[in-house]
Structures are given as C-alpha cells and as structure tokens.
Amino acid sequence: GFQYQREAQAYYEALKKRMSKFGLELESSKSKIIKFGRYAEQNRKALGQVKPETFDFLGLTFYCSKTRQGKPCIKVKTSKKKFRQKVKAMKVWLYENRDIRVKDLMDKLSIKLVGHYRYYGISHNGKMLANFRQRTIEYLFKVLNRRSNRRSYNWGGFTEMLRYYKLPYPKIYVSLFD
C-alpha cells in the first residue's frame, strides 16, 4: 500500500506503462485506487460516506475494521462470490456422489472440507468457514435422504451418524498477526 494518493497514482500509471510494453493492459473494471487502511474510516466519514471500500483478491475480501481495543486493522473473509460458488460446487459434488457408501462419502467429504479450510483458514475468517461447514451438513442431510424412496435419516439419526463419522471443524491455518 501507499501512504499518499499521488504515490499510488504514480505507481498505477507506471504499471500500466510497463504492462503495455508486453502487450498487456489492466482491466479498468478490476483495478482501481481505493482509500484503505488506518485513516480510511475517518476520511470517509468526513466526506459523508459510510464504510471504507473493500477489495477482493484471490477469493478473499479485504476490509477495514477495528480490534477489540478499538484500534483500526485490516481483516479478511471469504468473498461472497467465491462463497456462493464453493457452496454450489459442494452441493453438486454431494449430489453426484450420493450413491457411494456412506463411509467413503464421509471420508472424501472430510478431505474436501479440510482443503477448503486450508485455503480460506485465515485470521478473522472463522465465521465464513463455520457457515460453509453448516451449509455442507445441510446439503449432506438432503442428499442422504434422496438415496431411496423412503427417508433414510431424521435429524436425530443424522446427528448420530455425524458423531460416528466426524466431519472436521474449521481451523485457522494462517495467522496474519504472527
């Protein structure tokens, strides 16, 4: 990041120029200069705007927030777009694999969940990871009940099955503050 807008503007122009040397160009809808960081909230309030802008990068949304002590900090969470895509992909995967044995399904599902947690398991993203796990469990319940003409599980039996085939809980793998 840059402390002053003129520095950011100079870098932005230099980047455009450098990329044009190689026949590349910046997508203007995906690149912009935003006020971000320690004073972003104060500056936006002075202009009569509500919250500081956010930006998405590699499936994560970066936003300005405050610590428990009230100090400004930058936080990260799964972007809404990627969250919806991943939930939909998980739903499709569950429906495609509903005919395999429950033990095998749960083993593969555990591996998929851990992979998701490892990529998105960053400081301050625990809530989105928990939401993903919960949505996965809801779809798993629906999928397992569509395996035959009669209902396979009620919610009590399903939670009993989940106690036997434990699904991993979300874990923060990368701390931004170490």
Model-flagged regions — what are they?
Residues 1-178:
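Non-catalytic terminal/accessory segments
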